[in-house]
UniProtKB/Swiss-Prot annotation:
GO terms for cellular component: extracellular region. Gibberellin-regulated protein that may function in hormonal controlled steps of development such as seed germination, flowering and seed maturation. The gene is GASA2. Keywords: Disulfide bond, Gibberellin signaling pathway, Secreted, Signal. The lineage of its organism: Eukaryota, Viridiplantae, Streptophyta, Embryophyta, Tracheophyta. It is found in: Secreted. It comes from Arabidopsis thaliana (Mouse-ear cress). GO terms for biological process: gibberellic acid mediated signaling pathway. InterPro entries: GASA (IPR003854). This is Gibberellin-regulated protein 2. Belongs to the GASA family.
Length: 99
């Protein structure tokens, strides 16, 4: 019984320390994304949608996806394997959103 209690107390201490560490790092929210460089979504999407028959619709969808993922696959179509986040966003109907 004593072994069970000591194990339980040790586990509780570990959980509390882990929770504390997560809260401390979350408080430094400004520092979390400092190393990430934002890409030029407008320029990348302009290139991506340059051959689209519905350019405005393509640009709107592309910019939305780029702002979420900070990534636009190269070329005018395809290459979505280079940007998995971009390739996984779907509409409410289950269709791929990003051009």
């Amino acid at each position: 019984m004593a072994v069970f209690r000591s194990t339980l107390v040790l586990l509780l201490i570990i959980v509390c320390l882990t929770t504390y560490e997560l809260h401390v790092h979350a408080a430094d929210g400004a520092k979390v994304g400092e190393g990430v460089v934002k890409i030029d979504c407008g320029g990348r999407c302009k290139d991506r949608c340059s051959k689209s028959s519905r350019t405005k619709l393509c640009l709107r969808a592309c910019n939305s996806c780029c702002s979420r993922c900070n990534c636009v696959p190269p070329g005018t179509s395809g290459n979505t394997h280079l940007c998995p986040c971009y390739a996984s966003i779907t509409t409410h109907g289950g269709r791929l959103k990003c051009p």
